[in-house]
Amino acid sequence: MRCPKCLLCLSALLTLLGLKVYIEWTSESRLSKAYPSPRGTPPSPTPANPEPTLPANLSTRLGQTIPLPFAYWNQQQWRLGSLPSGDSTETGGCQAWGAAAATEIPDFASYPKDLRRFLLSAACRSFPQWLPGGGGSQVSSCSDTDVPYLLLAVKSEPGRFAERQAVRETWGSPAPGIRLLFLLGSPVGEAGPDLDSLVAWESRRYSDLLLWDFLDVPFNQTLKDLLLLAWLGRHCPTVSFVLRAQDDAFVHTPALLAHLRALPPASARSLYLGEVFTQAMPLRKPGGPFYVPESFFEGGYPAYASGGGYVIAGRLAPWLLRAAARVAPFPFEDVYTGLCIRALGLVPQAHPGFLTAWPADRTADHCAFRNLLLVRPLGPQASIRLWKQLQDPRLQC
């Protein structure tokens, strides 16, 4: 009596195994057709950062730590994960995506003004470069004979002239293998002073302003990241590393270059380096700049590097842009980058030399900076003074 039962069980197990193999094979086949690879070879796998891939259904990765309650962002992410190949957040029109947010979020009217504005236009990711009325200069592409090893992509705002000049005179000053760019939106808008002619003069003088025709407000910082990734793909695809930093950061450029050049090649190819936050949760207290309503997002944040300053491998740019098309918009650029990194199956690398909450009372101690790579915030005068001290060959620590 036992033998027939054993044979029946064995037959059932073999059938289930065959079905599993078939499902995995057909799923992998659909994935390869739905997502052609970006140009070039993907970053090499490493034990900490395996080769990036983009699942046909992103919920296989994002859904592991993001629950599916009634929060709007979570619902949108699951919808994006099931879209057909080629569809993204702009499918059906980016304004339509924003209008849906206003109608589907029951307490949308109670959201802070900036968050409401973000949601109404968050899916709009295609903006032309902006040329000042005074005839500013377009930023040149990276030439085949002059590809930067490290691109310094610094987020700024039109009126922060002193901060940009301080960067030019200090850690962003000309050096072999270094190129400096500032990322700005349009200086036109929101009842401020007319900065058009001043920005035009600055653009002609330095040719280092990447300007786009969108309103430069805090919740558009994610947009700057996405437009930079697209610009890199068209104009500087072979850059080795990209530092994305705020204009009030101070970077010990020689120390950062030394660290990057010492990295093992496999690690360098998929690098996402900075001051890493893990197991962070949304702030639920209304009134703060990082307030997130429960009706918008539920769950914890992914591991991410602080938006004050971090480094990515240049080879990751097309992969991040590809992932971003299938990750629902989020108002904080560092968290959003962390979501895209996780969608690619990568993890951030923490470095103790990145400190984005530097205490003001330590600024006078220039020796404290010898082993650091990036700190913020520092004002223009403090940055210039510190840079001169660090360049002094007589410096004793």
Curated annotation (Swiss-Prot):
<keyword id="KW-0808">Transferase</keyword>
<keyword id="KW-0735">Signal-anchor</keyword>
<dbReference type="GO" id="GO:0016262">
    <property type="term" value="F:protein N-acetylglucosaminyltransferase activity"/>
</dbReference>
<keyword id="KW-1133">Transmembrane helix</keyword>
<keyword id="KW-0333">Golgi apparatus</keyword>
<comment type="pathway">
    <text>Protein modification; protein glycosylation.</text>
</comment>
<dbReference type="Pfam" id="PF01762">
    <property type="entry name" value="Galactosyl_T"/>
</dbReference>
<feature type="compositionally biased region" description="Pro residues">
    <location>
        <begin position="39"/>
        <end position="53"/>
    </location>
</feature>
<dbReference type="GO" id="GO:0008499">
    <property type="term" value="F:N-acetyl-beta-D-glucosaminide beta-(1,3)-galactosyltransferase activity"/>
</dbReference>
<dbReference type="GO" id="GO:0070062">
    <property type="term" value="C:extracellular exosome"/>
</dbReference>
<feature type="glycosylation site" description="N-linked (GlcNAc...) asparagine">
    <location>
        <position position="57"/>
    </location>
</feature>
<feature type="region of interest" description="Disordered">
    <location>
        <begin position="33"/>
        <end position="58"/>
    </location>
</feature>
<comment type="function">
    <text>Beta-1,3-N-acetylglucosaminyltransferase that plays a role in the elongation of specific branch structures of multiantennary N-glycans. Has strong activity towards tetraantennary N-glycans and 2,6 triantennary glycans.</text>
</comment>
<keyword id="KW-0812">Transmembrane</keyword>
<keyword id="KW-0328">Glycosyltransferase</keyword>
<comment type="subunit">
    <text>Interacts with B3GNT2; this interaction greatly increases B3GNT2 catalytic activity, independently of B3GNT8 enzymatic activity.</text>
</comment>
<dbReference type="InterPro" id="IPR002659">
    <property type="entry name" value="Glyco_trans_31"/>
</dbReference>
<dbReference type="GO" id="GO:0006493">
    <property type="term" value="P:protein O-linked glycosylation"/>
</dbReference>
<dbReference type="GO" id="GO:0000139">
    <property type="term" value="C:Golgi membrane"/>
</dbReference>
<feature type="transmembrane region" description="Helical; Signal-anchor for type II membrane protein">
    <location>
        <begin position="7"/>
        <end position="23"/>
    </location>
</feature>
<protein>
    <recommendedName>
        <fullName>UDP-GlcNAc:betaGal beta-1,3-N-acetylglucosaminyltransferase 8</fullName>
        <ecNumber>2.4.1.-</ecNumber>
    </recommendedName>
</protein>
<dbReference type="GO" id="GO:0016266">
    <property type="term" value="P:O-glycan processing"/>
</dbReference>
<keyword id="KW-0472">Membrane</keyword>
<comment type="similarity">
    <text>Belongs to the glycosyltransferase 31 family.</text>
</comment>
<keyword id="KW-0325">Glycoprotein</keyword>
<feature type="topological domain" description="Cytoplasmic">
    <location>
        <begin position="1"/>
        <end position="6"/>
    </location>
</feature>
<feature type="topological domain" description="Lumenal">
    <location>
        <begin position="24"/>
        <end position="397"/>
    </location>
</feature>
<dbReference type="GO" id="GO:0030311">
    <property type="term" value="P:poly-N-acetyllactosamine biosynthetic process"/>
</dbReference>
